[in-house]
C-alpha cells in the first residue's frame, strides 16, 4: 500500500488553455457564460498575455487561465489527451437553447451520458 502525502492546503487552482484570439475568448467566457476577468497580465518580452477568468475569487474557486501567444496564427493542436472544461448549470437544456440563440455551436445536444443518467451537453469555444 502506498503512503498518502500530506495534502493540507491543496486545492485545484486553475486549468490553462491556449487561445488564438483573447478578445473572442473573453466575449465567449465572460459575456456569454458570465465569468469575470480576475486578472490579466501582458508579458511583452515573452510576447504573450495571461488572463485568469472565473465565477468566483481566484483564492476560493478554480478558474481558467487563458494564455494568448501574440504570434500564434494557426489553431492549436489539442492532441488526444485533452477532454473538456466542465461548467455546471441548473438547467442544461435551457442553457443550450440560450447558447444556440447566441450563435454558440452545440456539439452534443443535452441528454443522458452514455452508460449513465447524468445529463450533459457540449459546446465549442472560439478555439473549437
Please provide the spans of the model-predicted regions.
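Compositionally biased, low-complexity repeat tracts
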Residues: 5, 42, 50, 75-77, ...
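Vicinal oxygen chelate
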Residues: 21-23, 69-127
